[in-house]
A protein has these predicted regions:
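A general structural signal for well-ordered alpha-helical segments in protein cores
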Residues: 41-42, 119, 144
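C-terminal helix-rich "cap/oligomerization" subdomain common to oxidoreductases
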Residues: 124-152
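Short Pro/Gly-enriched beta-strand edge/turn motifs at strand-loop
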Residues: 47-55, 80-86
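Electropositive phosphate-/nucleotide-binding environments in soluble metabolic enzymes
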Residues: 35, 39, 116, 131
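Conserved C-terminal active-site "lid" loop/helix of NAD(P)H-dependent oxidoreductases
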Residues: 118-124
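Predominantly a Rossmann-like dinucleotide-binding segment in NAD(P)-dependent oxidoreductases
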Residues: 1-53
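C-terminal substrate-binding/catalytic lobe of Rossmann-fold NAD(P)-dependent oxidoreductases
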Residues: 62-117
Length: 152
């Protein structure tokens, strides 16, 4: 059996009360947390570690969702939340509202900073014709759809 990487994703980006009343807080309009804050990570994971072999959702409420994926080249534990109460106290103490950690084979990567202009740059590239094709995006969209609608 080939070696499988161990990958963990913990992504918490606290949202204010507005979130509950906006289209982003409505799963029917936004696709839910897996789509809203997770799509880019699931896309990256599939690109790096291959196709989904197993998909388990272990927890879901209005502000948090978590699960486990078996991909061709990695076992992935993931946790997504927009709940301020889920932030580590050390992050709250610094008056920060985001905690983004990836761990690959016990090596931790903190990417809590650096997201400021990411969407703007992405949209600019799309307008230049440098977007992705439907065929390239289908696996990620199918995965987040399954995650959002999977029975626990």
């Amino acid at each position: 059996m080939p070696f499988k990487n161990s990958f963990n994703l913990k992504y918490i980006t606290a949202r204010g009360r507005w979130y509950d009343y906006s289209w982003k807080g409505d799963t029917k309009k936004s696709g839910g947390l897996a789509t809203n804050i997770g799509i880019h990570f699931f896309d990256m994971l599939l690109w790096i570690f291959g196709n989904v072999k197993e998909n388990n959702v272990t927890y879901r409420d209005d502000k948090t969702i978590s699960g486990f994926l078996k991909l061709e080249k990695a076992n992935v534990n993931w946790f997504l939340s927009c709940d301020y109460d889920k932030l580590p106290q050390s992050i709250k103490d610094k008056n920060q509202r985001a905690y983004r950690i990836m761990t690959l084979d016990n090596q931790e990567i903190d990417f809590s900073d650096g997201f400021t202009d990411l969407h703007t740059i992405s949209y600019q590239e799309i307008l230049k014709g440098n977007g992705f094709s439907i065929d390239e995006t289908i696996p990620s969209i199918a995965l987040v759809h399954e995650i959002t609608n999977k029975n626990i």
